[in-house]
Amino acid sequence: MGSPRRIVTTLAAFLLVPTIVSAQATRQDVTPEQRARMQVEREARIVAELVSRRPIEALNSIWIEELTWMEVRDLLQAGTNTAIISTGGIEQNGPYVATGKHNYVLEGTCEGVALKLGNALCAPIIKLVPEGDIDEPSGHMRYSGTISLRQETFEAVLEDVASSLEAHGFEHIVFIGDSGGNQRGMENVARTLNERWHKAHAHFIPEYYQYG
């Protein structure tokens, strides 16, 4: 059973479909001048919306995906300056443990770290990571159910997610990974971002995985 907020969001999406279809049909009859004016008006509405007050009580969650954009904005303005990007994986974990083990672990540990810090939010867990070669399966890819990303794909995803968070005003982007194959990519991306950024900082935390 989903949360009440998710149920309402899903229903709203279904109700919007007829409106979207109607708007698409109307746009076909609009002149270039009218389209330009509509674009200016649309931009003005967006600018006003970006500074508008949140109309509902804030949800008590540290997961960005569970918050509205206004809730994230207000938390940033109130001093929440850290975002945690956690990486898990879908891989074989023996005959008794689910392939999503690392992702399930991170649901608890990322939240615990964020709550301990007190000024942090958790980005959506990166659930797909390098697990071995795909074309000629190696590593975990030799086991059914494993899903792998190429190393360059993984690093590109990390870089884009971190850059998105930095663009919104997060000053500290923290990388933690629950699997050994994730560590090199996070370290590489953190180094690249720190060379590029002037104010924000990327932090790769190897101790999260290598705690022994």
Predicted segments with their positions:
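Bacterial N-terminal signal peptides that target proteins for export
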Residues: M1-L11
